[in-house]
Amino acid sequence: MEEQKYNLKESLAELDKLFDLSAKETDKTACEALAEKARIIYEQYPESEDIALLYARILVNLSTKQIELEELETTVEKLEKLQQKFRDSPDIALHYAITLLILSNKQTELKEIEATAEKLENLQQKFQDSHDIALRYARILFTLST
């Protein structure tokens, strides 16, 4: 894949386009290609929270198309790394929480779901004012209770 250099403003505009495409895309392979392009742009500006957030949004769109547990786990790990880098960003944390919930819905082993729930609990404790993260945590607790 040809790496193209962008300035920050152009990179944000390009990521906006990639996000829009990933939201409309139904093909997983095409969405993976969009996520890869987004990763390349993110790696050019790894300190930009705005770039990281758009990359996170594209990863969430990809996660909704992933059926295989291993693929989804890889995507969740990428979001976890983004969240660790931008620890104080409730927006990036929310996108990580969304993928954790998606992951929990694919997991079949109780211990796996509990480990995912613990990660969501930690996010919810850090971002107590985020009703959106709390909602994802409540949903995973509901899953565990059934």
Give the location of each predicted region.
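Helix-turn-helix repeat elements of alpha-solenoid scaffolds
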Residues: 24-40, 67-78, 109-119
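Alpha-solenoid repeat scaffolds
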Residues: 25, 29, 48, 65-70, ...
